Every structure is written in C-alpha cells, then in structure tokens.
Swiss-Prot record:
Compositionally biased spans, kind Basic and acidic residues: 279-296, 345-355, 404-413
PANTHER family: C2H2 FINGER DOMAIN TRANSCRIPTION FACTOR (EUROFUNG)-RELATED, ZINC FINGER PROTEIN
Keywords assigned: Metal-binding, Nucleus, Repeat, Zinc, Zinc-finger
Compartments it resides in: Nucleus
UniProt cross-references to Gene3D superfamilies, sorted A to Z: Classic Zinc Finger (3.30.160.60)
GO molecular-function term, one example from the UniProt record: zinc ion binding
Name listed for the protein in its UniProt record: Zinc finger protein rsv2
Region (Disordered): 1-41, 145-164, 169-207, 221-363, 404-427, 440-558
Length: 637
C-alpha cells in the first residue's frame, strides 16, 4: 500500500476547524466490528483514501463468516466525545491478531501450536518433515484459534516409544477457526529416538569399529539383521522350553577332538532378557536335574564325577553355547577349549539355545581364523628340521613338565581355566629352536636372518633391563655368562667350550645369507675401565664393539659427560677453603671465567669488599657490579 496519504489524513484530523471524527473499533470475541458511525464533512472516500476498495471489490474479498460492515463516511454521529484519537488510516488496516485463549492448556513440548500457512520450516525438531527438509503441513490461521498438538504418550510411562509402536504418529487436533469453516488436522511421523531405552536393547558383547544407525544391529556373524518397524528384534526363547539332548564324552577321544566334531555355532550374541531371569533359570535347571532323560544320557564317566552330576548341563550339546564372542570384557575369538572353561564358570550361558540360521557362515569364519592362526605357527615338517638343519639336539629353556611329545588329557584339563585363549594346534615345545644364550630374550625376535649372539667367557655383560625369568642351563650347553668372580683356572676351559659351541653354531647357520656373519671372539677386544671408575657403585658400562681400548674409554667418558652433566668432573674446580665451614669448596665450573668470578666474590681473595659510600658500613657488596646496581636503584646514580 501507499502510505504517503497517511500524513494528509492526519493533517485533516488534527485541524480544529474540520472536526474530523474517527470511528471506534474494539474487539468482540475474535472479530473486529464497527460500533459507531462518523461523518466525513462531505468528502468522498476516494479523496481521503485513494487506495480504498470499491464496493464490488469489497464484496469479493469479504467472507460471510467475518460479518464485516462497510464504512460509510457520510453517516453523521452526534456523540463522539468518548472516541479514541485514532488515525484515519489505522482502522483500514484489517490485520488479523492471534489471541491465545487456551494458553494454559497448551502443550509445552509443541512449540508450533498455531502453525502459519506461510511457514516453510517447522520449529519442532522431532518432526520427520523437519528432518526431510520439507514444508510443514499447513493449517489455516484464525483469530483466537489454538491448534494444539496432542501427543500420544507411550504405554510404559517412559518418554521414549516402545518397540511395539511401529508407527510413531502425532496427531494435530485443530479447533474450529474463526475465519475458516473446516477443521484442520495434520499428522506427522516422528522417527524413533536416537538413544533407545535400556529395556529394549540387549547387552552386545562386541564392539564395532564403525558407527551404525540406531535401526541397524549386527549379529555375531557380521550380518545386518532385517530392518522393520521394530529396530531391535531379539527373539528370546521361552524359559520353559525343553533342554537340548546331551552328548556323552568318549574317554578315548581328547577334549579338543570332541569339541572339533561338534561344528555348529550360534549366529548372534546372547539375549540379556533371558539371562536376567535368574530365578526362573534356576527352577528350570532344577527341573532338568530331576528329569530321567538327562540322567540316562550321562555317561558312566560323568556319573562318577560329582561336579558333573550336580550340573548335568555340562554334558549338553555345545550348540547352545558355542559363540564366536564372549562377554563384554572380551571381544576376541574363543577356541573350543577356552569356551568350555567359560561354560563351566557360567552355567546360564550353556542353557541358552541359539538359532542355527548362520551356522555355516560362523563355521566358515571360525575355520578361516583357525587356518590363519595355524599359518603363524611352525609346520610339522619344519619342527624337527629348521632351515635344513636338525635342531632336536638344541635344548630349550622351558620347564621340564612342558617338554613332552604330546599333551595328555590331564595337562589339557589343567590348562582349561586359563584366561588367554589357548592355541588349537599344539606342537612339540622342544622342537622350537632356542637361543644359545640363557638370557631372557623374546623368542619371537629370533628370525632366520638374525644369528644368535655368542659372547666369550672373558667378557662381562651388564644388561640394562632386569632379567624377568631365571636362567636355566644344561650339560649340553656350557655357561656362557660367567660372573665377575671367575678365577683364571677355569678360563681356558670356558674358552674351549665357547669355541666348540661357536663351531656348532657356525655349522648350523652356514646356509644363511652372506651378510649375517658371526663375529670371531678372538678378534674382539673388550676394554673395561678400571675399578677406580667414578660411578655410584664403582662399576662402569662395558662397550663390546671391536675398537681400541683408548677410543672406547674416551667415548664412554664423553657419553657420561653428556648425559650426567650435574655429576660430571668438570674442567675447573675451586680448591679454595670455605671461610664459614673451613672445608674445601670443590665447586665445579665449566668455564674458567665462572671459576674466577666465584673466587673473587665468594672467597674474596684478590679484591676487597665494595661498600656503599652513601649507606656507609651498613651496605657492602662482594661484587662491583652489585654495588653499581645498588647505586642505580636505591640512590638514583
């Protein structure tokens, strides 16, 4: 509209001679009505209001529900003393004003209670249209109407929808509007909450390295479960189901072979809804103990064992408990032996039957992982012969109870409760090539291109890391680590033993590459600084590099100076006597200038004490620069 004529209308109304009256507009419910008539002093409407509608246009835009009355400027009004001073342009601005009549009953969680048709985006972040960047469903606006959205609360009383509510719908009930004769209702779908309630989620015993949406759950085999209305489908079995048929353990078969025969594996993690009901599970276990069918399936070997009789589920089929994943604390793969130990600790896990939909997939995964683990171990053909040489004569540092050709059943039963998953493929421990030295070196660091370290008997080795395992020697391998208390009598014997062992090692590693050469101990010169070394314990580090004695000693001393600067023997030392204690000062300085300044100030042998002339004898200084600073700061000189 053109607002330039507003000034002209105000000038007419402000003129005292014209007495231009203004009508009185007031609210009546939700409508604006004209209560009084006024006169225009013979002026036409087009002269005062050039932009006013004509009668035909007014009839077109007016609605019968509004009950608007046409303003007649020629009508006279006698009593207009109580009229408010309104501009002639203001009452023509028929602007709808929203009135919240039912403000107390508004839903505080629905901010857009009266959505306007001109709104492009809603203010409700929970609406699906907001997430899809679409327009909000339009509802006709009116005067005094309150389109209040009524949300349906969940049945369980929580703020989050349950899994049974497949379609999350919020209906908007709109009251009859003042200027519209129809009821408006809008329905919008709300997505499930980002964080579901704890009652609808099972404890997942594995961790994914990637983030999944809230509707996608991966089972134990890595497959994505079906996505339907329920984002968390967990088909928990009933508690009163029949137990699985038991199996009998043959005494002739080993535990590992019996576990390998049973190849059916579950597909997903265990459901916590079934494990939480401890009382029902105990009752079901007690019922299983009294059943005759379970007692008949128990073999005589297990009947003799009281622990097996107390818990007959130990002999059940391992289909119900053999899972690829363990509890929440351990997400690694478990071998059948380690799984049996976990089953003995948790009897509830064994009683949980799992579906066999992904048995083949899980079995293939387990076989692939077992093959990958076996590829890291030495093969059977390379057990006795390592790199073309027979190493069965080489003794091992392991304990004697481990050195046996095959693990018997007793040792397997003793190793079952171990926390770490055991290796499914066992091989002879003594066939592993051991180190020549009896030190605690990591056996995994021994590679075909890395020869063993041989040190002659006249060399003392001081290792920086402490020994973590005791050194075990045997009659076949002499002691190559003599201590400092060795006398000169056994030195030739040790030297000959070391030479003989060195020849064996050379013959063993003669097929290696040409760049790996074992150093000759006869050409190795080891220089050790004397007992007068200035260390804390009187010991000095040993450098076994084949260099000269003077070079090694100088390098070791230079290294100590670099890393032990505070404890080094400096180039200059103060030998003057301290006047207070009467002892030698022995202060070490790295520069001669620092030593001279120290002697001139602390000991004051060459220069007198500097006194302040202004302060007198009260202030005296041992250094001249201190006196100059005092005069500048205190006295302004």
């Amino acid at each position: 509209m053109d607002t330039t004529n507003n000034t002209y209308a105000r000038s007419i109304s402000s003129n005292g001679n014209d007495n231009f009256p203004t009508p009185d507009w007031q609210f009546n419910g939700s409508q604006l009505q004209q209560n009084r008539k006024s006169k225009m002093n013979g002026r036409s409407v087009t002269n005062v209001f050039p932009n006013a509608f004509s009668d035909a246009e007014f009839e077109q835009i007016s609605m019968p529900e509004l009950n608007l009355k046409r303003f007649n400027p020629t009508t006279l009004e006698e009593n207009n003393s109580d009229l408010s001073d309104m501009s002639s342009w203001d009452y023509m601005m028929n602007v709808p004003i929203r009135v919240y009549n039912d403000a107390d009953t508004m839903d505080p969680f629905s901010l857009d209670t009266i959505p306007d048709s001109s709104m492009d985006m809603p203010f409700d972040p929970l609406a699906s249209d907001y997430g899809n960047a679409a327009n909000f469903p339009s509802v006709p606006s009116s005067l005094g109407s309150n389109h209040q959205f009524i949300t349906t609360p969940p049945v369980n009383g929580s703020n989050e929808p349950t899994s049974a509510q497949t379609n999350h719908i919020i209906t908007a009930n709109s009251s009859p509007s003042g200027n519209a004769g129809s009821n408006a209702s809008a329905s919008m779908s709300v997505p499930p909450p980002l964080t579901p309630s704890a009652s609808t989620i099972n404890d997942q015993p594995f961790s994914n390295s990637f983030d999944l949406p809230s509707q996608v759950i991966a089972d134990g085999t890595g497959a994505i479960s079906d996505i339907n209305g329920n984002p968390f489908p967990m088909n928990s079995p009933p508690l009163d189901m029949e137990p699985l048929p038991s199996i009998s353990m043959d005494a002739s078969d080993s535990v590992s072979e019996q576990l390998v025969k049973d190849a059916s594996l579950p597909s997903g993690p265990f459901s916590t809804d079934y494990l939480e009901n401890g009382s029902d599970l105990k009752r079901s276990l007690g019922h299983n103990q009294k059943s005759d069918r379970v007692s008949k399936d128990v073999s005589p070997q297990h009947q003799a064992n009281p622990s097996t009789l107390n818990n007959p589920l130990k002999t059940q089929n391992f289909d119900s408990s053999k899972n690829l994943y363990t509890d929440n604390k351990d997400s690694s793969l478990v071998s059948p032996t380690g799984l049996q130990s976990r089953m003995e600790q948790n009897p509830e896990v064994r009683a949980h039957p799992m579906k066999d939909s992904a048995t083949s997939t899980a079995l293939r995964r387990s076989h692939a992982l077992g093959a990958a683990a076996d590829s890291l171990l030495p093969q059977e053909n390379s057990a006795q012969i390592y790199d073309g040489k027979d190493v069965s004569m080489v003794n091992d540092n392991m304990h004697s109870d481990v050195r046996q050709d095959s693990f018997n059943k007793e040792s397997i039963k003793q190793r079952i409760p171990s926390l770490s998953p055991p290796i499914t493929r066992s091989y002879n421990a003594k066939h592993r090539p051991s180190l020549v030295l009896g030190t605690s070196v990591n056996p995994h660091s021994l590679s075909p291109s890395q020869p063993p370290v041989v040190v002659p008997s006249n060399t003392t080795i001081s290792s920086s890391p402490p020994l973590t395992s005791p050194v075990k020697t045997s009659a076949n391998i002499p002691n190559l680590l003599p201590t400092s208390e060795l006398d000169s009598s056994n030195a030739p014997h040790s030297q000959s033993a070391a030479t003989h062992d060195l020849n064996d090692v050379k013959s063993y590693y003669n097929t290696r590459s040409s760049h790996s050469v074992v150093p000759n101990p006869t050409n190795q010169k080891v220089s050790i600084t004397g007992a007068a070394a200035d260390g804390p314990n009187g010991s000095a580090p040993v450098d076994t590099t084949p260099t000269n004695s003077s070079t090694t000693a100088t390098g070791a001393q230079r290294k100590r100076r670099k890393f032990k600067f505070g404890k080094q023997i400096g180039p200059v030392r103060c030998t003057l006597q301290n006047r207070v204690t009467g002892e030698i000062c022995n202060t070490v300085f790295s520069r001669t200038y620092d030593l001279i300044r120290h002697q001139d100030t602390i000991h004051a042998k060459t220069r007198p004490v500097f006194r302040c002339e202004i302060c007198g004898d009260q202030r005296h200084f041992s250094r001249h620069d201190a006196l100059v600073r005092h005069l500048r700061v205190k006295h302004g000189r």
